[in-house]
């Protein structure tokens, strides 16, 4: 299984879940508000908002929180956020992309830079690691929807590019611009997905041992603790033996 899928499994096992959950709700709400403010407040007419609402629901964000986030955008009292992407290297040369939404660019740049340097990494220029990733759409399904062949056929029909199937489930990739269309076609065939989102998919990975993984997790945890940070993507790879010890 590729590194980006393993990260979800680590987060699932980590003990910081309650605090992390409330922070996640707040980040997902912010994405909903920004998406609704930039386009139509109806998710059916606004693909970005539809994805934001879907991601919130798949993370068990309550409906009233979702509705409130949309209402905040339409009520005119939503803050203005800049979306800024930072790129750098973590411990052992792992590539790291940090996506932020901020109402104060100087504060965010300073915090992100300091977090990298305090945790064995260094912040680079935009584009310094981006070439090691591709922007893709990702749709995930549980293993219970069908075997690998069934899901592969549905994915081909839907216009997807690639499928990774394992005992943990199915991960379907498509061009970033096709995500809305592909996810609709998949849902017509396989039912509602577990998650549908845009991701940075590593094209090259860096293998880490246990110590390297522990250092990387420390950096990612520190970055994700910043309220301005929406998501962090890395290109680590680690063996199942290493993952089992985390």
Swiss-Prot record:
Gene3D superfamilies: 1.10.10.200, 3.30.70.980. Keywords: Cytoplasm, DNA-binding, Transcription, Transcription regulation. It holds the Pfam family TACO1_YebC_N. Disulfide bonds: none annotated. GO terms for molecular function: DNA binding. GO terms for cellular component: cytosol. Its main location: cytoplasm. This is Probable transcriptional regulatory protein TM1040_1893.
């Amino acid at each position: 299984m590729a590194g980006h899928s393993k990260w979800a499994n680590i987060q699932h096992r980590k003990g910081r879940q309650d605090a992390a959950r409330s922070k996640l709700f707040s980040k997902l709400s912010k994405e909903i508000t920004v998406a609704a403010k930039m386009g139509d407040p109806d998710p059916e007419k606004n693909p970005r908002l539809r994805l934001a609402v879907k991601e919130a629901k798949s993370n068990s964000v309550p409906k009233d929180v979702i509705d409130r986030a949309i209402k905040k955008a339409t009520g005119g009292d939503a803050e203005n956020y800049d979306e800024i992407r930072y790129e750098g290297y973590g411990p052992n040369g792992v590539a790291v992309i940090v996506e932020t939404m901020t109402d104060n660019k100087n504060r965010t740049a300073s915090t992100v830079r300091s977090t990298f340097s305090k945790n064995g990494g260094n912040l680079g220029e935009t584009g310094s690691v981006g070439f090691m990733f591709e922007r893709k759409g990702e749709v995930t399904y549980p293993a219970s929807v069908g075997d690998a062949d069934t899901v592969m056929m549905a994915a081909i029909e839907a216009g997807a590019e690639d499928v990774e199937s394992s005992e943990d489930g199915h991960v379907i990739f498509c061009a970033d611009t096709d995500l809305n269309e592909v996810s609709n076609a998949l849902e017509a065939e396989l039912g509602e997905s577990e998650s549908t989102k845009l991701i940075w998919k590593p094209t090259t990975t860096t293998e880490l041992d246990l110590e390297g993984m522990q250092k990387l997790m420390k950096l990612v945890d520190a970055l994700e603790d910043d309220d301005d940070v929406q998501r962090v993507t890395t290109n680590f790879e680690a063996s199942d033996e290493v993952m089992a010890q985390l």
